[in-house]
């Protein structure tokens, strides 16, 4: 991902304020509510029958935290996202058979959640930088797909 110095600073400054537990669970939960077909990958998570059930599901929250932890790792390796996410790309492609479009959807949901949490602080410049980052991460996660 090519980010200007200003964009990198904007991304890292905001990310330093992100509560990974809270934002991760909310982002994954919203993905599952807004795009219900994505729930098929999480059937072992128990009750996903209503938006409230999804948003309060401890397994959704825990996995969201894990997902955002990996995203955090990617932010420290913006110049090598494909290498950083190679193992996760392989896992999601070969073992889990996740449609790579879901990575793009989750990235866009994450941007919405960040905007919700940070309000005026999430300026158009910050949003543009995050859109580049989530697109780069989605591309890296889709890399092993044939």
Swiss-Prot record:
Keyword terms of this UniProt record: Acetylation, Heme, Iron, Metal-binding, Oxygen transport, Phosphoprotein, S-nitrosylation, Transport
Gene3D superfamilies: Globins
Binding-site positions, heme b: 63, 92
Residue list for modification N-acetylvaline: 1
Modified residues (Phosphoserine): 44
Modified residues (N6-acetyllysine): 59, 82, 144
Pfam families reported in the protein's UniProt record: Globin
SUPFAM superfamilies assigned to the protein according to its UniProt record, in alphabetical order: Globin-like
Tissue expression notes: Red blood cells.
PROSITE patterns, per the entry: GLOBIN
The UniProt record lists the keyword Metal-binding: yes
Domain Globin span(s) in chain numbering: 2-146
Modified residues annotated as S-nitrosocysteine in this record: 93
GO cellular component annotations of the record: blood microparticle; haptoglobin-hemoglobin complex; hemoglobin complex
InterPro entries linked: Globin (IPR000971), Globin-like_sf (IPR009050), Globin/Proto (IPR012292), Hemoglobin_b (IPR002337), Hemoglobin_oxygen_transport (IPR050056)
UniProt modified residues of type Phosphothreonine: 12
GO annotation, biological process: hydrogen peroxide catabolic process
GO molecular function: haptoglobin binding; heme binding; hemoglobin alpha binding; metal ion binding; organic acid binding; oxygen binding; oxygen carrier activity; peroxidase activity
Subunit structure: Heterotetramer of two alpha chains and two beta chains.
Family as reported in the entry's similarity comment: Belongs to the globin family.
Function comment: Involved in oxygen transport from the lung to the various peripheral tissues.
Protein name: Hemoglobin subunit beta
Species for this entry: Mico argentatus
